[in-house]
Swiss-Prot record:
Zn(2+) A binds at residues 189, 211, 220. The gene is DCT. It is found in: Melanosome membrane; Melanosome. SUPFAM superfamilies: Di-copper centre-containing domain (SSF48056). Its main location: membrane. Forms an OPN3-dependent complex with TYR in response to blue light in melanocytes. One of its GO terms (biological process) is developmental pigmentation. This is L-dopachrome tautomerase. Plays a role in melanin biosynthesis. Catalyzes the conversion of L-dopachrome into 5,6-dihydroxyindole-2-carboxylic acid (DHICA). It catalyses: L-dopachrome = 5,6-dihydroxyindole-2-carboxylate. It holds the Pfam family Tyrosinase. It comes from Sus scrofa. Its cofactor is Zn(2+). Belongs to the tyrosinase family.
Amino acid sequence: MVPFRWGLLLGCLGSALGPGAQAQFPRVCMTVGSLQAKECCPPLGAEPSNVCGSLEGRGRCAEVQADTRPWSGPYVLRNQDDRERWPRKFFDRTCRCTGNFAGYNCGDCKFGWTGPNCDQKKPLVVRQNIHSLTAQEREQFLGALDLAKNTPHPDYVITTQHWLGLLGPNGTQPQIANCSIYDLFVWLHYYSVRDTLLGPGRPYKAIDFSHQGPAFVTWHRYHLLWLERALQRLTGNESFAVPYWNFATGRNECDVCTDQLLGAARPDDPTLISQNSRFSSWEIVCDSLDDYNRRVTLCNGTYEGLLRRNQVGRNSEKLPSLKDIEDCLSLKQFDNPPFFQNSTFSFRNALEGFDKADGTLDSQVMSLHNLVHSFLNGTSALPHSAANDPVFVVLHSFTDAIFDEWMKRFSPPVDAWPQELAPIGHNRMYNMVPFFPPVTNEELFLTADQLGYSYAIDLPVSVEGTPDWTTTLSVVMGMLVVLVGLSALLLFLQYRRLRKGYTPLMETQLSHKRYTEEA
């Protein structure tokens, strides 16, 4: 099986979002002066001296802490990729916020907190099954996605060149682009999986910061939280929650691929989205990975064609089943060495889909997350382009729900996550690429309620793995029935013997009847 390789990109401008929408880099820091100084510590508000909200006790400008522990895996280069020791190829100093403050200038609150001083717990936002949404809730979700696709981001921009060429050929023009909110969501994913650029036509492909390792679960969790907060602000609804798609149907059809939800297939070309769906006009970004590698450049947000799904020819493939979810949730180890796509009996690797759902390894089999992407095919089939499809949002919401259920069942200690020798980007204290300000994997290795949200869901429990009182009672009752039966048989035999007396052994006639035959 070819390992998943995914991606995303675009440019951003103004709307109703705030400084907590943490993505690539804040526009205010993408100046020649800031890039040369490698410092992104903007003031909060109009007062220039209020750097990082320091006058209000919200934060200060500080040295970036980047993980330097050794990594393992196929990436063996050093100082060749601008994502190493993220984000120090770009900035050495950023705002470090205190308490529950957050954001590139400490002007926001951490997930799950609110109030002027970020000291008030927000009510949990509840992520529901997309099929359980009311007509109004469904329209709000779909409309918010479409609005995000067409609304420039107010605060963040993306880079269109790697760090050595970031200031342009003359060193005076930062190579950046604006993007829509949703396309920035796509770009973040693309950037996390793109190849290392070594020269024209010389990509180094053995690298992935968001897949094939422990960070798969935390990276996608933060990615989804980022979008959810952006949509909350875009809609003016702080209780807005992205729904999930329970893909564990075991069927060979996509039940969210309808015109009422995320778009049916177009009758005259089933690889395109039905023209009755708002998503039929969505164009994709960051799809031409080979072209970027040839030109030694990054995705710049140019539209590259329509969104596609291609389930034609996939009829023999079926989505995961509830039994697969049950098997995955029975795995007690979060991850196992080598913390890569060949780890066995690893909850993370089974959920990601490189292991079978029960944790055994079969290189010819895809399961769970990987299987769903393969099933959708088209734009969803490759990591660098998959997030273009809005199904990505509800697919990963359900994947995160499974992760959250595992966290609640097993309450793993923090050292269940390796501090070192995971693939690059996947050590516990590595700053997740390309989120900014920096945030580590460890900070997301929590239950969802600690991050301000929950799921309206009941996931299956393995009877074998988690015996309860009903199982014990069934066993006891079965034993009692057997004892009563034996007692009755003994009494009957005793009765027969008393009536007929004894028959000498030599005179006994042995029966040749089988147990399944009538006497």
